[in-house]
Amino acid sequence: MWPLGALAELLDNSQDRECGSTRVEVDAYVLNPSRDKGGYCITVQDDGVGMDRARLNNMLSFGFSDKEHLSGNVGRFGIGFKSGSMRLADDALILTKRDGMAHCALLSQSFLDAIGADDILIPMFSWKMEDGGRYLASEPTDATEWSSNMAIIENYCFTKSEKELLTEMDKIQGSHGTRVVLFNLRKREGESNGEGEREHEFDFSVGNDIRMLGDTEDKNNRGLSSKNTSRRPVFQ
């Protein structure tokens, strides 16, 4: 799948009619530069109705779809999220709020590869949202399971504690919406930079644009204005 096409899959999910969003934001920035050596992430966030725990679980269940196949409706619970997110990054943190509850899940290829998992293991958490911006832990109810899941977050996510996880949750302003953070972005196959490392598929160096790597080089080589250089879509 073409990388910008994968990003479009995630945008389609956020703009889906049952999502109910009026605004979808796409961003790219460096995660914890002092901790993660300047690794970029891509975020997709909407102000829709959000998901409850069951719907979040269904979204992450490969092959699951509970949607009516309406014309023009790609489907939040179809294959779009899995194919789009895993095409762009090894890891995805999904955070969502709905009906007074907050939920998150980590879909991590890095974790699965590290433990040699045969099954797709996905740590999930739920909190009850209380007055004053406080969160009350809800699920998992078993303390051992909670600690085990949090250890996965601490080892394989850019958030290294429950506090940092909830700080990320607070980026969803208000009582509903969904935020997807893609990190450990995939790199170009068979191509490396001067230090022998593979390059990212995206170029984040041009203002607020997210471009395919190569668009900027094309502009410089042809001496053309940025208005006419890119042959591919540019998200702003």
Predicted regions and their residues:
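Amphipathic alpha-helical transducer elements in NTP-driven molecular machines
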Residues: 4-8, 53, 74, 78, ...
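Interdomain "switch/hinge" adjacent to the Bergerat
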Residues: 17-75, 91-93, 97-236
